[in-house]
Structures are given as C-alpha cells and as structure tokens.
C-alpha cells in the first residue's frame, strides 16, 4: 500500500444508486487472486455490449472521462456480496477514491483495507459534484485525508468521517498486518512483562 495524504484529481460521475459488487466486477473475474488485469472487468456489463465492443454511451468510455481518478457514485455503493476484487478493479482502472452519500459496510471495509479511500459526503455536496461533472467533465477536486475534507473548485469544503485507526494506516501506507509488525517491539515487551499463564484462584 502507498501512503495517502492528499488526492487531487478529476472526477467522473456515476450517480446511479445501489450499484452492487456484481455490477462493479462480474463473478467470472473472481477466480483469480492476482490483481493485475481486473480493470478489464470493471463495470463490464455497462462498458461493453453483447459482442464485447465498448459501449460509447457509458460514461467511462467517453473521451472526457479518461484519466479521472475520483469516482462520484450513487447511494449505497458496493452493496451485495463481499468481494475484494471490487476495490481491486477500481484501483486497477486508476481510481484512488470513491465519493458517495453512503457505502455498503462490507465494501467500505474492503476498500479501505486495500488502500482505496471511500469518502462519504452529505447529499448537497454529492449533488454539487454530480452537477459539476455534467457541466465541466474536467472538474478537479482535492481530498485531504489529514483534515478529512473535500475541497470543491469554488473553495467550498465538506468534511467526511473516518475512524482514527483506518486513517492512521492510510496515512502511513500500511495495512493491519503492517501496523502489527510496526508494533512488534511493544508486543514483545508486553509479553515479556506478563506471565504466559494467568494466575487465578480457580481450581483446575
């Protein structure tokens, strides 16, 4: 994982609500454990037609959407079955963050643990972002993890929630295992200071 501090990038809006993980990445792509190549399957049923040709009407296939790194998605994004391949596919495509009024809990947890920032905003900010993209597809926003803010082109800022432990891990670019490894000395010191068996008054 790479440290996340400030993400500055163009947005692309996919405002449909209740986009589930099967729509994000079809089940046939779940047979692999290698993250490479999963970008091909991202929103496959929408990006391609029945013959496998790109659908020119889908937003990600439009020229103005190329290079966007921040996805603005509808409510309850990532609902459905749990699959780490969903955030992997989004990252493989080039997305560094997803902004939505709400996320499915399992998707949000999987995304954050894999270094994909999920930004939950209020409805007003979300609607403004969707409108900005429709008016100007080159719109850029700034996401500051340290201050937990999203800055819009007009300077307006909106805060987003994130738990302190996850925030720390993302800022440091480590996962839960990496955090434990960083605390190895403290863990060893604790174990050395405590007996392997807890003394009680209970009879064996």
Curated annotation (Swiss-Prot):
Alphabetized UniProt keyword annotations: Amino-acid biosynthesis, Branched-chain amino acid biosynthesis, Leucine biosynthesis, Lyase
E.C. code: 4.2.1.33
Catalytic reaction annotation: (2R,3S)-3-isopropylmalate = (2S)-2-isopropylmalate
Record GO biological process: L-leucine biosynthetic process
EC supergroup of this enzyme: lyase
InterPro entries assigned: 3-IsopropMal_deHydase_ssu, Aconitase/3IPM_dehydase_swvl, AconitaseA/IPMdHydase_ssu_swvl, IPMI_Swivel, LeuD
Involved pathway(s): Amino-acid biosynthesis; L-leucine biosynthesis; L-leucine from 3-methyl-2-oxobutanoate: step 2/4
Domain of life of the source: Bacteria
Pfam families, A to Z: Aconitase_C
Keyword Repeat: no
Cellular-component GO terms for this entry: 3-isopropylmalate dehydratase complex
Gene Ontology MF terms in the entry: 3-isopropylmalate dehydratase activity
Record function comment: Catalyzes the isomerization between 2-isopropylmalate and 3-isopropylmalate, via the formation of 2-isopropylmaleate.
Quaternary structure annotation from Swiss-Prot or TrEMBL: Heterodimer of LeuC and LeuD.
HAMAP family membership: LeuD_type1
Family per record: Belongs to the LeuD family. LeuD type 1 subfamily.
Name this protein carries in UniProt: 3-isopropylmalate dehydratase small subunit
Organism for this UniProt entry: Roseiflexus castenholzii (strain DSM 13941 / HLO8)
GN (gene name): leuD
